[in-house]
Amino acid sequence: MRFRIYKRKVLILTLVVAACGFVLWSSNGRQRKSDALGPPLLDAEPVRGAGHLAVSVGIRRVSNESAAPLVPAVPRPEVDNLTLRYRSLVYQLNFDQMLRNVGNDGTWSPGELVLVVQVHNRPEYLRLLIDSLRKAQGIQEVLVIFSHDFWSAEINSLISRVDFCPVLQVFFPFSIQLYPNEFPGSDPRDCPRDLKKNAALKLGCINAEYPDSFGHYREAKFSQTKHHWWWKLHFVWERVKVLQDYTGLILFLEEDHYLAPDFYHVFKKMWKLKQQECPGCDVLSLGTYTTIRSFYGIADKVDVKTWKSTEHNMGLALTRDAYQKLIECTDTFCTYDDYNWDWTLQYLTLACLPKIWKVLVPQAPRIFHAGDCGMHHKKTCRPSTQSAQIESLLNSNKQYLFPETLVIGEKFPMAAISPPRKNGGWGDIRDHELCKSYRRLQ
């Protein structure tokens, strides 16, 4: 009798466990199905611990992370499921390349200009850029590609409201956010920035053999911008399907730029002038950082100069031919010890490109840098103040905008320009090899 009672209890318990298991399995199955059928998680919050500052051109600064005490190398952490889901989603979105604000008949093709905006995590400035685009004449003809290295609900919401031009979003697949605890992010086994090489070798940190030119070890947040820029350059020219046979120009912007309402009007006239009077010009730029109070007498003039990274890195426009010459310099770009993409380009004009770059640039700028604060500046970020100053300048000169013709104002002597100095931050062989690999990625 005791044996039969015990058997009955075991049977009942088994049935209860089986029923609970079935309920849990059904619940998970429904969730998986919901995830599979639901829209992409473009409005999801960023991965934990992924907040990083944007990097601008300037001198490399010591971050608070560098002051961490020395600790022995630790085992590599496991990747959490949320991070893996984001990696998978980024891959899928980059493959799908869903265009918005175009017809569904499959006949749409880009015009003579495409904009590519490198976006990090400054939505307050991105909002200003989008507002300036909205005011630009002819913008409905221009494809705008937003290239992201940070995923946030606020940023994606901003871009979802762009209804005035064709839009494509792509995502840098090797961001710190997608690799928060391993390379290309910050691996806990990496050497601390200021550790001497001998001490690093004794400690056994994984990049001990590869400090930069100043004896410092890599900091992921400084390395990311150069990685993103080079990946984006290759991806838009080689992997964006709608641009496979594109013969126009691509204008490269950043999230803290601001465009004049006649930028597209002026750009088209610059391109025509380049073809007619400056066939030797390699690139176009929409402006410099020089402070201008009045457009009087200069609104219809452009100059021919030697390209200089500290002056002509805003609104840089490249043809496919210029891109192909750049990509042939992949090894030089990817191994030059400077974490700034533009100062590295300056080095390429001396060390690798067939000749120094000749740039066509307007005397009255059609692009402005609204984000003159942040990592390399001590100013407080006040986007509304900066945008008000730019709008005031444009309003006070609106009678000079949209010139009927453009003429070359000055042709400056062409002379090689060396980078002011090498900033370092790019000595790690892992950065070199990842950077080189973008050319091989499908």
From Swiss-Prot:
Residues bound to substrate = 118-122, 149, 224-228, 293
Q: Which UniProt keywords apply?
A: Disulfide bond, Glycoprotein, Glycosyltransferase, Golgi apparatus, Manganese, Membrane, Metal-binding, Signal-anchor, Transferase, Transmembrane, Transmembrane helix
The effect of disrupting this gene, in the record's words, is: Decreased embryonic survival between 9 and 15 dpc. Surviving embryos are about 20% smaller than their littermates by 15 dpc. Most of the newborn pups die during the first week after birth, and none live longer than 4 weeks. Pups are about half the size of their littermates 8 days after birth, have dismorphic facial features and severe locomotor deficits. Pups display impaired muscle development and defects in bone development including a hunched spinal column, plus poorly calcified and brittle bones in vertebrae, ribs, femur and skull.
For this chain, the annotated S-S bridges are 191-205, 278-281, 329-352, 334-435, 373-381
User: In its keyword annotation, does this UniProt entry include Disulfide bond?
Assistant: yes
UniProt-listed SUPFAM superfamilies = Nucleotide-diphospho-sugar transferases
What processes in GO biological process is this protein linked to? oligosaccharide biosynthetic process; protein N-linked glycosylation via asparagine
Q: What class of enzyme is it?
A: transferase
**Which InterPro entries is this protein grouped with?**
GlcNAc_II, Nucleotide-diphossugar_trans
- Where does the UniProt entry say this protein principally localizes? Golgi
Q: List ligand-binding residues for Mn(2+).
A: 256, 369
**What is the protein's membrane topology class?**
Single-pass type II membrane protein
Highest taxon of the source?
Eukaryota
Pfam families in the cross-refs: MGAT2
Instruction: Name the EC number(s).
Output: 2.4.1.143
User: Membrane-spanning regions, if any?
Assistant: 10-29
Chemical reaction(s) catalysed: an N(4)-{beta-D-GlcNAc-(1->2)-alpha-D-Man-(1->3)-[alpha-D-Man-(1->6)]-beta-D-Man-(1->4)-beta-D-GlcNAc-(1->4)-beta-D-GlcNAc}-L-asparaginyl-[protein] + UDP-N-acetyl-alpha-D-glucosamine = N(4)-{beta-D-GlcNAc-(1->2)-alpha-D-Man-(1->3)-[beta-D-GlcNAc-(1->2)-alpha-D-Man-(1->6)]-beta-D-Man-(1->4)-beta-D-GlcNAc-(1->4)-beta-D-GlcNAc}-L-asparaginyl-[protein] + UDP + H(+)
Those parts of the protein on the Lumenal side are 30-442
Q: Which GO terms describe its molecular function?
A: alpha-1,6-mannosylglycoprotein 2-beta-N-acetylglucosaminyltransferase activity; manganese ion binding; protein homodimerization activity
The entry assigns this protein to a family as follows:
Belongs to the glycosyltransferase 16 (GT16) protein family.
Output this protein's name: Alpha-1,6-mannosyl-glycoprotein 2-beta-N-acetylglucosaminyltransferase
- Lineage of the source organism? Eukaryota, Metazoa, Chordata, Craniata, Vertebrata
